[in-house]
Regions:
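Radical SAM enzyme core and accessory elements
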Residues: 1-37, 327-332, 341-473
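An N-cap/entry alpha-helix motif that binds or orients negatively charged groups
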Residues: 36, 40, 47-84
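Canonical Radical SAM [4Fe-4S] cluster-binding loop centered on the CxxxCxxC motif
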Residues: 80-81, 85-121
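Generic structural signal for well-ordered alpha-helices
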Residues: 88, 126, 154-161, 185, ...
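Core AdoMet radical
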Residues: 107-124, 128-231, 236-246, 268-275, ...
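Conserved C-terminal portion of the radical SAM core fold
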Residues: 141, 195, 200, 221-285, ...
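Short glycine-enriched, charge-decorated loop/helix-capping segments at active-site entrances
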Residues: 211-217, 288-292, 359
C-alpha cells in the first residue's frame, strides 16, 4: 500500500502506485485540458507530484513539450539564476564486494586494475585538482568493509580539507559511498561533509535484485531507505539519482519523484540534488546489453520535468554526457556539472596510459579541460561558479530549502558566484578565459539589485585582484 510518510521502502516506493501512475499517464497523454492544467500548476513554482509529472512525460504533443522546456528554463533562472556550479569526482578506491552487473568494479571482474589511494596519493590528487581550480569534490569509493571501511573514508575527508596548495583549497566534500548505518552517517556529518549522494540505480525491486545479485547492495530495502538513515544521522543535504537505462525510464522517473516526495513528507526537506546519469561503456560493461536505454531527446525531457516537478533541487549532469548533450540540457534546468573529470583511481596526478589496464568506472564523454569548460559556459552566458558558501554559512537542509523555495538564494549566490569566478580567473584561467570572464563579471555585477550588496561585491572583486581570497555573503 502506497504511503509517502512510511519508512518502509516498498510503501513509499510502491510498485502498485507506480503502475497505476503509468496507466493514468497513458490514459491522459493526449488530454490537452489536463495537460494545460498541470502546466499551469507548474508555473506556480511549487512543483508537481509524480502522477502529474508522469502525464507530461507521456505526452508527445510537440508544442506542450516546448512549453515544459521553456518553463524549466525560466524556473531554473528564478531559483538559481544563470549560475552553473562546477565540481569534480575523486575516486578513492575501486575495491568492491558487490556484484552489480552494470559496473566494472564488480567483484568478479578480474582484469580491472584494483587501486586504493593512500593519504600521500590523495595529497597528489587534490593538489592536481586545486591546480585546475576546483573547490568542490565528490568522493567515490566501492563498497568493501576491509579495504574501504568508514575510518578510511573519514581519514580521506580530513586529508582533503587539510590541503592548501598555493591559493587552492577544497571547500566542500560531497560523499558518494554505499548505504550505511545511522552511526556511520553521523560520523560523516561530524567530518564536515556537504551532500551525501546515493544513486538508487533502479526503483524496480525485481530488476534491482537481478542487477545486484550478490553483496550487501543486493538488499533493496536497506539501500532504498538509506536517505532516511542519513537524515536521522544528522546529514542535512542528500542527493538522489537513478541510472537511466537499467529499467523502463517512465517507471524510474515516477519512483524518483516519489522518493523526493517521501523525503519532503517525512523530513520536511526534499533532495538537495538530483543526478541523471545514463549507463555508459566501461571496461567489461557494454551499455547495449541493457535494452532500456533512452534517446537524447527523452533524456532532455526528463531533465526538464525534474526541474518543473522539483523546482528547488540542484540538478547534476556529469561528464558521462558529451558536450553536445550538455549543450542540449543546460537550458532545461541543470545547475551543476562536473568538469575535467577522471573516473580512474589516481587519474588526476597520473593519468592512465592508453595501453594500461584501466581502473575507470566508466568512459568519460566530455574530455575538455576545466578551463575549456569554464570558457564554454561563459560564452553561453552562464556564470561558472565555484561557490561553497551556503554549506560553510550553515545554509543547509531546511534552512537552504526555505531560502530556495522563496527564491532568496539569488541574493547571496549571484555575488558569491562572481567572486569565486574572479578567484578562478586570477589563479588558473587562460588569457582568453580571463578576458571573457572579466567582461562577464562586469556585466553581472550591475545586475545585483541591492546597492549595499553590489558595493560590497565590487570591493571584494577588487580585493581578489589584489591577492585576497575566500569572501562570501
Amino acid at each position: 500500500m502506497y504511503n509517502a510518510k512510511s519508512l518502509k521502502a516498498e510503501e513509499f516506493i510502491s510498485d502498485e502506485e507506480i503502475k497505476e501512475t503509468l496507466a493514468y499517464a497513458d490514459a491522459n497523454k493526449d488530454n490537452v485540458a489536463l495537460i494545460d492544467e498541470i502546466i499551469e500548476k507548474a508555473k506556480l513554482r511549487k512543483g508537481l507530484n509524480h502522477r502529474e509529472a508522469s502525464v507530461l512525460l507521456a505526452c508527445e504533443i510537440p508544442e506542450k513539450i516546448q512549453e515544459v522546456y521553456d518553463l524549466a528554463e525560466q524556473i531554473k533562472k528564478d531559483f538559481y539564476g544563470n549560475r552553473i556550479v562546477l565540481f569534480a569526482p575523486l575516486y578513492l578506491s575501486n575495491y568492491c564486494v558487490n556484484g552489480c552487473v552494470y559496473c566494472p568494479y564488480h567483484l568478479k571482474n578480474k582484469h580491472i586494475a584494483r587501486k586504493k589511494l593512500t593519504q600521500e596519493d590523495i595529497v597528489k590528487e587534490v593538489t592536481a585538482l586545486q591546480d585546475m581550480g576546483h573547490k568542490r569534490l565528490a568522493i567515490e569509493a566501492g563498497e568493501d568493509p576491509v579495504n574501504n571501511p568508514i575510518e578510511y573514508i573519514l581519514e580521506c575527508i580530513k586529508t582533503i580539507y587539510s590541503i592548501k596548495h598555493k591559493n587552492g583549497a577544497i571547500r566542500r566534500v560531497n560523499v558518494n559511498i554505499a548505504a550505511t548505518t545511522v552511526e556511520n552517517y553521523r560520523k560523516l556529518k561530524e567530518a564536515g561533509i556537504g551532500t551525501y549522494i546515493l544513486f538508487q540505480e533502479t526503483y524496480h525491486k525485481d530488476s534491482y535484485e537481478k542487477l545486484h545479485p550478490t553483496g550487501p547492495k543486493h538488499d533493496y530495502a536497506y539501500h532504498t531507505e538509506a536517505m532516511d538513515r542519513a537524515m536521522e544521522g544528522g546529514i542535512d543535504d542528500v542527493g538522489l539519482g537513478v541510472l537511466f537505462g537499467l529499467d523502463l525510464y517512465r517507471y524510474e522517473f515516477a519512483g524518483l519523484l516519489m522518493h523526493a516526495e517521501h523525503l519532503e513528507a517525512v523530513h520536511g526537506v526534499g533532495p538537495h540534488t538530483i543526478s541523471v546519469p545514463r549507463i555508459k561503456h566501461a571496461d567489461d560493461i557494454d551499455p547495449s546489453a541493457f535494452d532500456n536505454g533512452i534517446s537524447d531527446d527523452t533524456f532532455a525531457k526528463i531533465c526538464a520535468l525534474i526541474r518543473v516537478s522539483v523546482p528547488y533541487t540542484g540538478m547534476i549532469i556529469s561528464t558521462r554526457e558529451s558536450q553536445e548533450v550538455r549543450n542540449k540540457v543546460l537550458p532545461l534546468g541543470v545547475s551543476q556539472i562536473s568538469g575535467a573529470s577522471k573516473t580512474s583511481v589516481g587519474g588526476y596526478a597520473e593519468p592512465e596510459k592508453e595501453d594500461e589496464v584501466t581502473s575507470e568506472q566508466f568512459d568519460v564523454s566530455d574530455q575538455r579541460t576545466l578551463d575549456e569548460v569554464v570558457n564554454w559556459l561563459i560564452k553561453l552566458g552562464y556564470i561558472p561558479s565555484f561557490c561553497t558558501a551556503c554549506y560553510r554559512e550553515g545554509r543547509t537542509g531546511d534552512r537552504f530549502m526555505a531560502l530556495c523555495k522563496n527564491m532568496q538564494i539569488l541574493n547571496c549566490c549571484h555575488p558569491n558566484a562572481l567572486m569565486t569566478l574572479k578567484e578562478y580567473l586570477e589563479d588558473y584561467a587562460s588569457e582568453e578565459t580571463k578576458r571573457l570572464g572579466m567582461e562577464l563579471i562586469d556585466r553581472e555585477l550591475e545586475k545585483i539589485p541591492n546597492p549595499k550588496v553590489k558595493q560590497t561585491a565590487y570591493e571584494h572583486i577588487h580585493d581578489i585582484a589584489e591577492g585576497k581570497r575566500d569572501f562570501r555573503f
